Curated annotation (Swiss-Prot):
Coiled coil: none annotated. One of its GO terms (cellular component) is membrane. It comes from Oryza sativa subsp. japonica (Rice). GO terms for biological process: flavonoid biosynthetic process. One of its GO terms (molecular function) is flavonoid 3'-monooxygenase activity. SUPFAM superfamilies: Cytochrome P450 (SSF48264). Keywords: Flavonoid biosynthesis, Heme, Iron, Membrane, Metal-binding, Monooxygenase, NADP, Oxidoreductase, Transmembrane, Transmembrane helix. It catalyses: a 3'-unsubstituted flavone + reduced [NADPH--hemoprotein reductase] + O2 = a 3'-hydroxyflavone + oxidized [NADPH--hemoprotein reductase] + H2O + H(+). This is Flavonoid 3'-monooxygenase CYP75B4. Its cofactor is heme.
């Protein structure tokens, strides 16, 4: 009996051990199987053969993508020809890309714009993330966009604002006219913003008396770069069509690049030869950005040890191109949208003017030192950036490695677009998202502590993360200074056949979110006459 009992116990023990081993193996292989199961790709609409979803984008891509997120969710996948493209359409999804996985999405995909216009990516906008890119960005950050540099360059911005006011005041008092003259406001603002930046960058005003053919050429180049840059080049996404250049985009880019390169070579040669007068109104004589860069090249003060990482004339020209493309029309466009919204909302305009009258008075013009006291006006600027971001879609980034976002698999090499415009109109974040309500940013409002500096992913007009706009601080100060000056110095009337409630607010999208119709207005001086008597 004892032997039989022992045999039974041994048999039970062996059976238990065997079952335990089987269960363990089953669990291990089950988990391994689950681990091997790939995550799904983000959802998205079915595309066309060869072209993918390109034909579905339409003329206003940001609006089309916003509508797609309503159907497929806040993270969608598209095919642009042979390229995988993912679109972030909500603040939480954008935060995963631009904060949690920022390092993985710090480079740009190669495209025809970077290759043919931006010196083959040897710039800050299109350049790949790495030592050269960091060195170039540091140059801009220290010499143009740091707090000290901004304060040093304050006189440029204020002087150009003064000249803009003088021009508008003279137009309003044109002899022989019974009513103020009409002006295309965007053009006036663009002269102001472009000249302020050009004085800081190359030591002279682009638009100035006697500037002549060179100024016209410069402006034409910047405008055409913005236009061509906003075109989706099919050849970037369908390699078989690249050599055909079916849209003629690459041919235009090459021609445009030659024009810009010739112009910059002449400017650099003149500066080196000493025939271009050094600016007498810069921080130190000759210490505009171009002068600093040329000195760096001449003195062999390389920021990196390797021969390939030197800053050369090519990098200088690429940087100057970046500055003018990213820092001129973007700024004037936001100011124009701000003024259009204020004209449409007379009560908000009145409130802004009352604040300015208290802070500044009516016997002088605004200065930058006044800006920190303009609580309501800062809320106005934030609300304009929310509804009318100058770049409604972020410039594309690229996944260096495969990763997981919001439970979906993002393939290596996938291109990322963030729908800045759509996120800022998300009713889950913004009550009454289509209404222009600066009060939402005031103390006691729904978004009191939100800023536009990349910290709040519901409002990222300058982007976020490592690739956030290098010129954020300059752009924000220039927009606020220019718009506040216009509101303080003038009342604004529309042409006789228009009323504020019927003002056309349609968008025209290239690389920028511009107005479909330019804002034409009549400026009426509202300060004491002595305020406009500027030496």
């Amino acid at each position: 009996m004892e032997v039989a009992a022992m045999e039974i116990s041994t048999s039970l023990l062996l059976t238990t051990v065997a079952l335990s081993v089987i269960v363990c193996y089953a669990l291990v292989f089950s988990r391994a199987g689950k681990a091997r199961a790939p995550l799904p790709l983000p959802p998205g609409p079915r595309g066309w053969p060869v072209l993918g979803n390109l034909p579905q984008l339409g003329g206003k891509t940001h609006q089309t993508l916003h509508e797609m997120t309503k159907v497929y969710g806040p993270l969608i996948r598209l095919r642009f020809g042979s390229s995988d493209v993912v679109v972030a359409g909500s603040a939480p999804v954008a935060a995963q890309f631009l904060r949690t996985h920022d390092a993985n999405f710090s480079s740009r995909p190669r495209n025809s714009g970077g290759e043919h216009m931006a010196y083959n990516g040897r710039d800050v906008v299109f350049g790949p993330y790495g030592p050269r890119w960091r060195a170039m960005r540091k140059i801009c950050a220290v010499n143009l966009f740091s707090a000290r540099a901004l304060d040093d360059l304050r006189a440029f911005r204020e002087r150009e604002a003064v000249l803009m006011v003088r021009s508008l005041a003279e137009a309003s008092a044109a002899p022989g006219s019974s009513s103020p003259a009409a002006v295309v406001l965007g053009k006036e603002v663009n002269v102001c913003t472009t000249n302020a930046l050009s004085r800081a960058a190359v030591g002279r005003r682009v638009f100035a008396a006697g500037a002549g053919e060179g100024a016209r050429e410069f402006k034409e180049i910047v405008l055409e770069v913005m236009e061509v840059g906003g075109v989706l080049n099919v050849g970037d996404f369908v390699p078989a069509l690249r050599w055909l250049d079916p849209q003629g985009v690459v041919a235009r880019m090459k021609k445009l690049h030659r024009r810009f390169d010739d112009m910059m070579n002449a400017i650099i040669a003149e500066r080196r030869a000493g025939s271009l007068l050094k600016p007498t109104d810069s921080r130190e004589e000759g210490k505009d950005l171009l002068g600093l860069l040329l000195a760096m090249v001449q003195e062999q003060e390389w920021l990196a040890a390797g021969e390939d990482d030197r800053i050369t004339d090519t990098e200088i020209k690429a940087l100057i191109l970046n500055l003018f493309v990213a820092g001129t029309d973007t700024t004037s466009t936001i100011v124009e949208w701000t003024m259009a919204e204020l004209i449409r909302h007379p009560d908000i305009l009145k409130h802004a003017q009352e604040e300015l009258d208290v802070v500044v008075g009516r016997d002088r013009l605004l200065s930058e030192s006044d800006l920190s006291h303009l609580t309501f006006f800062h809320a106005i600027i934030k609300e304009t950036f929310r509804l009318h971001p100058s770049t409604p879609l972020s410039l594309p980034r690229m996944a260096s490695e495969e990763c997981e976002i919001a439970g979906y698999r993002i393939p290596k090499g996938a291109e990322l677009l963030v729908n800045v415009w759509g996120i800022a109109r998300d009713p889950a974040i913004w009550p009454d998202p289509l209404e222009y309500k600066p009060s939402r940013f005031l103390p006691g409002g729904t978004h009191t502590d939100v800023d536009v500096k990349g910290n709040d992913f519901g409002l990222i007009p300058f982007g976020a993360g490592r690739r956030i706009c290098a010129g954020l601080s300059w752009g924000l100060r220039m927009v606020t200074m220019t718009a506040a000056t216009l509101v303080h110095a003038f009342d604004w009337q529309l042409p006789a056949d228009q009323t504020p409630d019927k003002l056309n607010m349609d968008e025209a999208f290239t690389l920028l979110l511009q107005r479909a119709e330019p804002l034409v207005v009549h400026p009426v001086p509202r300060l004491l006459p002595s305020a406009y008597n500027i030496a």
